[in-house]
């Protein structure tokens, strides 16, 4: 009985953590867009990058690529070309890995 309760608590914790992570990524993306509208480019870039990493870890490829492209554009805007292209290469690799994992084109 004690083992069953422990397993149920662990499952509930994992479910709550996943929901929190999903909401967190969406919130980061929203904050990044708001910062971009306010022309706070460095803050927006940082938030888009955090959202990209969060979506990538959740395997939400569409949102991850969108955030990655936005962060890359902000890197490029401030003449950080190496970082911009590195982020785009990582996004392309993420898509390739996702295609292999899902066995379909994204």
Q: For each predicted feature, which ranges?
A:
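Residue register of alpha-helical TPR repeats
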Residues: 26-27, 66, 105-106
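Amphipathic alpha-helical segments of tetratricopeptide repeats
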Residues: 49-54, 89-97
């Amino acid at each position: 009985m004690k083992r069953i309760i422990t397993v149920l608590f662990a499952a509930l914790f994992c479910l709550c953590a996943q929901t929190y992570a999903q909401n967190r990524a969406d919130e980061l993306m929203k904050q990044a867009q708001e910062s971009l509208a306010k022309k706070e480019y460095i803050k927006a870039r940082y938030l888009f990058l955090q959202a990209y990493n969060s979506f990538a870890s959740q395997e939400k490829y569409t949102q991850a690529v969108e955030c990655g492209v936005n962060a890359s554009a902000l890197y490029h805007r401030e003449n950080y070309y190496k970082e911009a292209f590195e982020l785009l290469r990582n996004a392309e690799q993420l898509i390739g890995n996702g295609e292999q994992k899902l066995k379909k084109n994204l």
